[in-house]
Amino acid sequence: MLLADFGADVVKVEQPGTGDPLRQWTTGGVPLWWKVYARNKRYITLNIKAPEGRALLLKMLPRFDVMLESFVPGTLEKYGLDWDTLRAAHPGLILVRISGWGQSGPGSRRPGLGTLVEAASGFAAMTGDPGSARPALPSFPLADMTSGLYAVNAAMFALYHRDTHGGPGQVVDVSLFESLFSLLGPLPAEYAMSQKVRTRLGNQSTNSGPRGCYVTSDGHWIAVSGSTPRMAERFLESYGLGELLQDPRFATNEARVRHAEDLDTAVRAAIGARTLADNRAIIDANALTAHPVQTIREIELDPHWQTQPLLVDVPNGSMNVRMQNVIPRLSETRGAIRSAGGDLGADNDAIFRTELGLDPAALARLREEGVV
């Protein structure tokens, strides 16, 4: 999606008849996940299990810089589309391979869905309520999205090496596991040093305090971050809790982390004694590092975001699909949303006939045989 947002010609290749599973994630019968995350692409169907399907893929390759696949490792090789075959068709090809556990190793061919990786990576074990034995999974495809961002960066690195330094095409191996594991901070270093497994802290932090979400007297929630000593001190002083800084339990950042529960009790009481409006007045007047917890409703009503191009309504048939706008915003080469995710095989004729030169009869036969 990111490359397509900035003008790349991205062709989504799907299985004839069924298409990408994302098309089945519907809201009110509308595949909104597909509409948003498959935007700005072209869409063809192609069965690579069929010899003619593989031949068409190899014929297409020289027209493109990057091929991205997310099959279980070994699938391309099973169908005769190994790296040697692909680079023979296109020596400068960048092949980006996304999988759950990486392309090699004894576990590489296990099912590698994002939920499994979120469980296996340590993320779920360290996320959730410390008072509960139940680990917590994210409510959105975190591992998939993280690996996708790594894949985009890797493709650009490889293209830069090829086009600027005269390098060859190459294979990029991106695993969901390593992508998510890389976000967990110094977890391996902590374990190597202490041999202790980090436990769930809820909304608290191992690095600073106060940190958490606290309910107001009228039932709203405020998130607080004291991630630097001065931020924490200013927060406590602004809420009339400055005397806590004279208490050895809260005098330093290290002490505040060590006594996080006691600090939480004081902060919870201070925020809980005030309405959302009163808390916001203190936060804004003192430039505190705290903010109300917002839903999409509050985000759309936020005066700041109402002045920014955060959202865009994209025409799609008889409806508009509201979605997040292109980011990042570049001053000279801004991206754009040209279309929402399209229909299965919408560009078969344009690509197979106009660009690859298949005649109508040949394309009709391939369609009848389930090749496209």
Across the structure, where does each feature detected by a protein language model lie?
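Conserved Rossmann-fold dehydrogenase catalytic segment
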Residues: 103, 132-142, 163-180, 199-206, ...
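Short, well-structured beta-strand/strand-turn elements
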Residues: 9-10, 284-298, 358-363
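Short Pro/Gly-enriched beta-strand edge/turn motifs at strand-loop
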Residues: 18-19, 192-198
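Terminal low-complexity tails and localization/encapsulation signals of metabolic enzymes
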Residues: 198, 215-217, 298-372
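Oxidoreductase and adenylate-handling cofactor-binding alpha/beta cores
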Residues: 148-169, 182-193, 236-243
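Glycine-rich beta-alpha junction loops
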Residues: 17, 101-102, 176-181, 218-220, ...
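Aromatic-enriched alpha-helical interface/lid elements that frame and gate functional surfaces
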Residues: 210-286, 290
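N-terminal helix-loop segment corresponding to the beta1-alpha1 unit
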Residues: 1-165, 343, 347-372
